[in-house]
Protein backbone atom coordinates (compact mmCIF):
# COMPACT_ATOMS: atom_id res chain seq x y z
CA UNK A 1 0.00 0.00 0.00
CA UNK A 2 1.09 3.56 -0.67
CA UNK A 3 -0.28 6.22 1.67
CA UNK A 4 -0.55 9.72 0.19
CA UNK A 5 -0.96 13.06 1.90
CA UNK A 6 -1.88 15.11 -1.17
CA UNK A 7 -4.92 13.89 -3.07
CA UNK A 8 -8.28 14.97 -4.46
CA UNK A 9 -11.56 13.16 -4.98
CA UNK A 10 -14.04 13.18 -7.85
CA UNK A 11 -17.57 11.98 -7.20
CA UNK A 12 -19.10 9.61 -9.76
CA UNK A 13 -22.91 9.59 -9.89
CA UNK A 14 -23.12 6.24 -11.67
CA UNK A 15 -20.74 4.51 -9.20
CA UNK A 16 -22.13 6.41 -6.18
CA UNK A 17 -18.58 6.73 -4.93
CA UNK A 18 -15.64 9.12 -5.03
CA UNK A 19 -12.52 8.34 -7.02
CA UNK A 20 -9.34 9.14 -5.06
CA UNK A 21 -6.53 10.64 -7.17
CA UNK A 22 -3.03 11.19 -5.81
CA UNK A 23 -1.65 14.71 -6.35
CA UNK A 24 1.90 13.75 -5.45
CA UNK A 25 4.42 11.59 -7.31
CA UNK A 26 4.08 7.91 -6.47
CA UNK A 27 6.90 5.44 -6.01
CA UNK A 28 7.02 1.80 -5.01
CA UNK A 29 7.93 1.43 -1.37
CA UNK A 30 9.57 -1.94 -2.05
CA UNK A 31 11.94 -1.09 -4.91
CA UNK A 32 11.57 2.74 -5.00
CA UNK A 33 10.66 2.65 -8.69
CA UNK A 34 8.44 5.44 -9.99
CA UNK A 35 7.42 3.32 -12.98
CA UNK A 36 3.86 2.58 -11.83
CA UNK A 37 0.87 1.90 -14.06
CA UNK A 38 -2.79 2.07 -13.12
CA UNK A 39 -4.24 -1.39 -12.64
CA UNK A 40 -7.81 -0.62 -11.63
CA UNK A 41 -9.88 0.46 -8.64
CA UNK A 42 -11.03 -1.07 -5.38
CA UNK A 43 -14.08 0.00 -3.40
CA UNK A 44 -13.52 1.06 0.23
CA UNK A 45 -16.23 2.22 2.65
CA UNK A 46 -15.61 4.42 5.68
CA UNK A 47 -17.74 5.84 8.46
CA UNK A 48 -16.99 9.53 8.93
CA UNK A 49 -16.98 11.66 12.07
CA UNK A 50 -20.58 12.77 11.50
CA UNK A 51 -21.74 9.20 10.92
CA UNK A 52 -22.04 9.24 7.12
CA UNK A 53 -20.97 6.28 5.02
CA UNK A 54 -18.28 7.41 2.58
CA UNK A 55 -17.65 5.19 -0.45
CA UNK A 56 -14.21 5.62 -1.99
CA UNK A 57 -12.72 4.06 -5.09
CA UNK A 58 -9.07 3.43 -4.26
CA UNK A 59 -6.60 3.30 -7.13
CA UNK A 60 -4.54 0.14 -7.62
CA UNK A 61 -1.15 0.50 -9.29
CA UNK A 62 1.33 -2.06 -10.60
CA UNK A 63 5.06 -1.48 -10.13
CA UNK A 64 6.91 -2.40 -13.31
CA UNK A 65 10.14 -2.66 -11.30
CA UNK A 66 9.15 -5.44 -8.89
CA UNK A 67 5.72 -6.53 -10.18
CA UNK A 68 3.87 -5.75 -6.94
CA UNK A 69 0.39 -4.25 -6.83
CA UNK A 70 -0.20 -1.38 -4.41
CA UNK A 71 -3.35 0.39 -3.22
CA UNK A 72 -3.00 4.18 -3.13
CA UNK A 73 -4.69 5.20 0.13
CA UNK A 74 -5.41 8.80 1.12
CA UNK A 75 -4.22 9.62 4.63
CA UNK A 76 -7.82 9.89 5.82
CA UNK A 77 -8.00 6.08 5.55
CA UNK A 78 -6.55 3.98 8.36
CA UNK A 79 -5.73 0.58 6.85
CA UNK A 80 -8.05 -2.24 7.95
CA UNK A 81 -10.30 0.10 10.00
CA UNK A 82 -13.90 1.00 9.19
CA UNK A 83 -13.75 4.54 10.62
CA UNK A 84 -11.84 7.41 9.06
CA UNK A 85 -8.74 8.84 10.73
CA UNK A 86 -10.61 11.86 12.14
CA UNK A 87 -13.13 9.62 13.92
CA UNK A 88 -10.43 7.37 15.35
CA UNK A 89 -8.49 10.41 16.58
CA UNK A 90 -11.63 11.74 18.32
CA UNK A 91 -12.08 8.40 20.11
CA UNK A 92 -8.39 8.16 21.07
CA UNK A 93 -8.32 11.72 22.41
CA UNK A 94 -11.32 10.94 24.62
CA UNK A 95 -13.87 12.97 22.70
CA UNK A 96 -16.59 10.36 22.06
CA UNK A 97 -19.17 13.15 21.81
CA UNK A 98 -17.57 13.97 18.44
CA UNK A 99 -17.81 10.32 17.36
CA UNK A 100 -20.66 9.14 15.11
CA UNK A 101 -24.09 8.37 16.50
CA UNK A 102 -24.57 4.69 17.15
CA UNK A 103 -20.98 4.15 18.29
CA UNK A 104 -21.36 2.04 21.41
CA UNK A 105 -19.03 1.67 24.39
CA UNK A 106 -17.76 -1.67 23.11
CA UNK A 107 -16.54 -0.13 19.86
CA UNK A 108 -14.97 2.82 21.71
CA UNK A 109 -13.17 0.37 24.02
CA UNK A 110 -12.03 -1.70 21.02
CA UNK A 111 -10.54 1.34 19.25
CA UNK A 112 -8.77 2.50 22.42
CA UNK A 113 -7.34 -1.00 23.02
CA UNK A 114 -6.14 -1.11 19.41
CA UNK A 115 -4.45 2.27 19.86
CA UNK A 116 -2.77 1.19 23.11
CA UNK A 117 -1.36 -1.88 21.36
CA UNK A 118 -0.42 0.26 18.37
CA UNK A 119 1.58 2.55 20.68
CA UNK A 120 3.74 -0.37 21.78
CA UNK A 121 4.16 -1.45 18.16
CA UNK A 122 5.15 2.07 17.05
CA UNK A 123 7.73 2.26 19.84
CA UNK A 124 9.35 -0.94 18.56
CA UNK A 125 9.23 0.03 14.88
CA UNK A 126 10.17 3.71 15.19
CA UNK A 127 13.88 2.89 15.22
CA UNK A 128 13.52 1.02 11.91
CA UNK A 129 12.04 4.01 10.11
CA UNK A 130 13.85 6.77 12.00
CA UNK A 131 15.83 7.63 8.89
CA UNK A 132 12.58 8.34 7.00
CA UNK A 133 10.67 10.36 9.58
CA UNK A 134 10.50 10.75 13.34
CA UNK A 135 7.42 9.06 14.79
CA UNK A 136 6.50 8.24 18.35
CA UNK A 137 3.33 6.84 19.94
CA UNK A 138 2.41 10.51 20.59
CA UNK A 139 2.62 11.47 16.89
CA UNK A 140 -0.55 12.30 15.00
CA UNK A 141 -2.38 9.29 13.57
CA UNK A 142 -1.87 10.55 9.99
CA UNK A 143 1.93 10.63 10.40
CA UNK A 144 2.04 7.17 11.96
CA UNK A 145 -0.19 5.61 9.30
CA UNK A 146 1.72 7.22 6.44
CA UNK A 147 5.16 6.27 7.77
CA UNK A 148 4.39 2.66 8.66
CA UNK A 149 2.22 1.97 5.60
CA UNK A 150 4.82 3.32 3.18
CA UNK A 151 7.54 1.30 4.94
CA UNK A 152 5.34 -1.83 4.68
CA UNK A 153 5.28 -2.16 8.46
CA UNK A 154 1.55 -1.60 8.95
CA UNK A 155 0.18 -4.48 11.06
CA UNK A 156 -2.56 -6.44 9.34
CA UNK A 157 -3.77 -8.25 12.45
CA UNK A 158 -3.80 -7.59 16.16
CA UNK A 159 -1.48 -10.55 16.76
CA UNK A 160 1.27 -8.70 14.88
CA UNK A 161 0.92 -5.80 17.31
CA UNK A 162 1.40 -8.07 20.29
CA UNK A 163 4.23 -10.19 18.84
CA UNK A 164 7.91 -9.73 19.72
Question: What spans do the regions from the language model cover?
Answer:
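Short, conserved DNA-binding cores of transcription-related domains
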Residues: 1-76
Amino acid sequence: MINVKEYHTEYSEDKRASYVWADEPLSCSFCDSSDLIRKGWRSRKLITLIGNLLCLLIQRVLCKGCGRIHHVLPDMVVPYKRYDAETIEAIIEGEPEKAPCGLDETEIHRVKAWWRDMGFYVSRKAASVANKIQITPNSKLHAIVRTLANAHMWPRTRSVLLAE
